[in-house]
């Protein structure tokens, strides 16, 4: 083991870079006394929950107001001097100090984008100094579970310029023994779907997350297309490949009513609609089936479908332990989506995952629609043995980067690698 002094933070650098949508984001680089360093770039979302931590943007005319030079300056002028001399191995202390300096409940002073970039870069610097992979540094010797991918192959909602209200229609290729075969299966279905769309004269343009964005009329039409694509690729729906949805219902919820596919539905009617979809399609997971503050509706939804499918809270929980605790008490869901930039530090992210585990909830590690080449979430999914990852479709290199990282991790683990899909899929054992 190296001397503790080797892990002292020397300085933190930061810069403005671009995400996959061409919007500015923050890259941070933490340098240690020993010469090791770690780098991280933060993502950003399009459909963001109202309760997420605050991204610091510049405003003004440059980059349509989305510049992050103010956040970069916060790192140089405030965060770097404060962290100098702290041990990078004490992630909790590093994150706690940044939270204390910020002094706001939603990190609106320093900005969650600046705090998170430094938080993630600190962990990577420690892993690099120890010469071990990030998943091993964040996890333990038993961190060998490769996640089932939830692949967003049809994009709608805020992620695509089409008429679909639901935001994501996902493939869940679980009926194989390893991650690499799961990835192959998803890729073949992706190409099968593209061929079908071509045949039907539908657009094969892709959305923010790399999935196709055809102008379909309904979720039912999207579901039918996916079943056809799965079978055309030679696989069995339900047995080998299941489906998952991200309704992103907050996006079409106004004044207690869900404005969905030309109809006005109350919570009970929306739940009935989701129940019909579950009955008619091999759906194993529904994310944000109801709006972020429709707590009564969520409890009703969980009572209706919680023993049949995974009910994932994204906007509902925003990777926040306080909101997750409320959901646990009120039995509002059975799973949490984990997005590191919703809460803004690695420590708080790990706390949310641990609370979910202790409460019998599953965790789905997730990207954002505005992504980068950073692959931290791939390592995080293996480190925490979450068993599931959402990182987009089978196109766009910022999505593929995470899949390729998981392939490398599986190769490194060799015969110790396990695949979550082979262990069974469902709300109790996904």
UniProtKB/Swiss-Prot annotation:
Keyword Electron transport: no
Gene Ontology cellular-component terms listed: cell surface; extracellular region; phosphopyruvate hydratase complex
Pfam families according to UniProt: Enolase_C, Enolase_N
Enzyme class, UniProt record, top EC level: lyase
Reactions it catalyzes: (2R)-2-phosphoglycerate = phosphoenolpyruvate + H2O
Active site (catalytic residues): 209 (proton donor), 339 (proton acceptor)
Annotated positions binding (2R)-2-phosphoglycerate: 167, 339, 368-369, 390
Record-linked InterPro entries: Enolase, Enolase-like_C_sf, Enolase-like_N, Enolase_C, Enolase_CS, Enolase_N
EC number(s) per entry: 4.2.1.11
GO molecular function: magnesium ion binding; phosphopyruvate hydratase activity
Functional note: Catalyzes the reversible conversion of 2-phosphoglycerate (2-PG) into phosphoenolpyruvate (PEP). It is essential for the degradation of carbohydrates via glycolysis.
Homology family: Belongs to the enolase family.
The protein, known as: Enolase
Organism, scientific name: Prochlorococcus marinus (strain AS9601)
Gene behind the chain: eno
């Amino acid at each position: 083991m190296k001397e503790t002094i080797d892990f002292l933070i020397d300085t933190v650098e930061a810069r403005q870079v671009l995400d996959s949508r061409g919007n500015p984001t923050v890259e941070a680089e933490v340098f240690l006394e020993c010469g090791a360093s770690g780098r991280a770039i933060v993502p950003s979302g399009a459909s963001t929950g109202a309760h997420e931590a605050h991204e610091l943007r510049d405003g003004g005319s440059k980059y349509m107001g989305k510049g992050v030079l103010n956040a970069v300056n916060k790192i140089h002028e405030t965060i770097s001097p404060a962290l100098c001399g702290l041990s990078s191995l004490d992630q909790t202390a590093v994150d706690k100090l940044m939270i204390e300096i910020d002094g706001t409940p939603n990190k609106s002073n320093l900005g969650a984008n600046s705090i998170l970039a430094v938080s993630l870069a600190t962990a990577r610097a420690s892993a690099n100094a120890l010469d071990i992979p990030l998943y091993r540094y964040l996890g333990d010797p038993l961190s060998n579970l490769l996640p089932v991918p939830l692949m967003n192959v049809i994009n709608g909602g805020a992620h695509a310029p089409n008429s679909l209200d639901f935001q994501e229609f996902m493939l869940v290729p679980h009926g194989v023994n390893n991650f690499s075969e799961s990835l192959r299966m998803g890729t073949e279905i992706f190409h099968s779907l593209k061929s079908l769309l071509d045949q039907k004269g539908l657009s094969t343009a892709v959305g923010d997350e790399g999935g196709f964005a055809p102008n379909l009329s309904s979720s039912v039409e999207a579901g039918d297309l996916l079943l056809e694509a799965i079978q055309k690729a030679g696989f069995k729906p339900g047995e080998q490949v299941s489906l998952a949805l991200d309704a992103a219902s907050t996006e079409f919820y106004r004044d207690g009513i869900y404005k969905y596919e030309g109809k006005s539905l109350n919570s009970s009617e929306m739940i009935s609609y989701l129940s019909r979809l579950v009955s008619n399609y091999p759906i194993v997971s529904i994310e944000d089936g109801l709006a972020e503050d429709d707590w009564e509706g969520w409890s009703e939804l969980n009572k209706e479908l919680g023993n049949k499918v995974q009910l994932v809270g994204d906007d509902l929980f925003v990777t926040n332990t306080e909101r997750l605790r409320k959901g646990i008490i009120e039995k509002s869901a059975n799973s949490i989506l984990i997005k590191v930039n919703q809460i803004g530090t690695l420590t708080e992210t790990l706390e949310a995952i641990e609370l979910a585990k202790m409460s019998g909830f599953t965790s789905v590690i997730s990207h954002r629609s505005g992504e980068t080449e950073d692959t931290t979430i791939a390592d995080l999914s293996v480190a925490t043995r979450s068993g599931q990852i959402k990182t987009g479709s089978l196109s766009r290199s910022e999505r593929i980067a995470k899949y390729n990282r998981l392939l490398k991790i599986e190769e490194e683990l060799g015969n110790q690698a396990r695949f979550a899909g082979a262990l069974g899929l469902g709300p109790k054992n996904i």
